[in-house]
Amino acid sequence: REEGSAVSRAARIVEALRTVHYQSARVGMLCLALTSQSDPAIMKVVEKVEAQNPSGEVQGQASLAIAMMLKGLGDDPEIMEKRIGHLRSAIIKAHEVEVGDTTVSKLAMDEIFIIQNLTKGRTAPDAIGRDSSGEPFKLSMLKGKVIVLAFWHTRMREAERGLSLLSKLHEQHGQRGVDLIGVTSDSLAVLRGLRANNTIPWRNFSDEDGRIHSQFRVRDLPIVYVLDAERKIRYIGGPGSFVDLTVEGMLAK
């Protein structure tokens, strides 16, 4: 009953926004809060706010909200172009509006960076750092090889399962020209301990300062990037069967 009541309250809020409050100067943050919803009807309401609210700042917040909701519709070029258009509008109209400890402008610029640098078909950044042995290492040293770049941490959600999936991937493809490279912000002592007991037999970046995580805009763990021989991104997502299918398809070429 509580869940049904929550849904009913949310529906009433959206309906009130659609019919009464869409021109209010105070609904910008509400539009951003609605980005967690995947209902197309909600996007239409936010689009109404963007088009008809008299405040440029509210229009900009609505533009950012629309761009974030479009993110869930895939990486089709037309969708990407629409997202960039809304993000640019957000930067122009609401660049100084604060959202938590950041601003609309920073959020929008970050999303544009991801679209232009961290989507399928783009060349991945050349992560540079040191591995668990303290040796200098960078992705470009592996040019010509398929790379599975896996961001993980011992305290991530379902860590045991995630590391098990990565271990299986390493076992299946490690001898077939595929390099599994981990990136973790765990302490160097923890990383070396896991290497010593063979829990993580693959090579890992030690990223205690989070620089590589920031470079790849990592927000949730685990996350895997599959890169081809030219370091172009072919898959982004969690470890599991889709990683295997992507790797198999690339090895078959």
What is each stretch, according to the model?
Residues 176-190, 200-210:
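Thiol-based oxidoreductase modules, predominantly thioredoxin-like and allied folds used
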Residues 151-168:
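Conserved redox-active cysteine motifs that mediate thiol-disulfide chemistry
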